Amino acid sequence: MSPPLELDYIGLSPPVPAAADAAADNDLKGTELRLGLPGSHSPDRSPPAATLDLLPAAKGAKRGFSDEARPLPASAAAAAAAGKGKKAAAGEEDEDAEEEDKKVAAAPQAPAAKAQVVGWPPIRSYRKNTMATNQLKSSKEDAEAKQGQGFLYVKVSMDGAPYLRKVDLKTYKNYKDLSTALEKMFIGFTTGKDGLSESRKDGEYVLTYEDKDGDWMLVGDVPWEMFANSCRRLRIMKGSDAIGLAPRAVDKSKNRN
């Protein structure tokens, strides 16, 4: 009895054997689109086997840990060391510059230069110094002259008095007016006397003054105008302390006259 035939009622194609599949794949490779120049054939690539070896590095892909851990060549290491040395040297230079700036800021400033005289033809140094000194003296004299034109206040002190007073010599015309004013200022400090004039008569207190030169002299030994211009300070001192002032005052007034 013959075996029954299988009829394809659904329209299925008969199964193709494996050899036929391989031939079909070869035919498809011939018509496959590939990148390359005309007439060139790229080699066939076989799929990699399933092994534990590291995959070859693809072009443009990230590097793996093994590639990163590779040691640098000697030239690259030398270049890196040179770069670090330059950075360290630059840092040291910056620190040195900062220290120099601090030293310059902490250094004391130079004193102001003295007044110098400039001229042509060139002036010698000793003449410059002489002319500068003369200018300073003239400026001081002008200041003193201006002071003499206005008010002339001088300090007045008395031995035993706890305070000082100031008087304007320009407001008095003679020694008598000045003595009367001082008597009113220091009344009460002359023990056992009616006033300063009585004490002066007895020699207990003497009116003295300090002149421009810093010398102490008795009041009344020179003309009033000369006294008013040269007086810098008044002092009512005890007669025992004024011993020796009168001769000096007389000699000085004679030299001025």
From Swiss-Prot:
Amino-acid biosynthesis is among the record's keywords: no
Compositional bias ranges of the Low complexity kind: 105-118
PB1 domain ranges (all copies): 151-239
GO CC terms of this entry: nucleus
Gene expressing this chain: IAA17
UniProt keyword terms in alphabetical order: Auxin signaling pathway, Nucleus, Repressor, Transcription, Transcription regulation
GO biological process terms, semicolon-separated: auxin-activated signaling pathway; regulation of DNA-templated transcription; response to auxin
InterPro entries the UniProt entry points to: AUX/IAA_dom, AUX_IAA, PB1-like
Database matches in SUPFAM superfamilies: CAD & PB1 domains
Role according to the record: Aux/IAA proteins are short-lived transcriptional factors that function as repressors of early auxin response genes at low auxin concentrations.
Any one Pfam family match given in the protein's UniProt record, by short name: AUX_IAA
Family: Belongs to the Aux/IAA family.
Tissues expressing this chain: Highly expressed in etiolated seedlings and flowers. Expressed in roots and green seedlings.
Organism: Oryza sativa subsp. japonica (Rice)
Subunit structure and binding partners: Homodimers and heterodimers.
Motif (EAR-like (transcriptional repression)): 33-37
Protein name per UniProt: Auxin-responsive protein IAA17
Region (Disordered): 1-51, 85-119
Cell location: Nucleus
Claim: rRNA processing is one of the keywords in the record: no
Induction: By auxin.
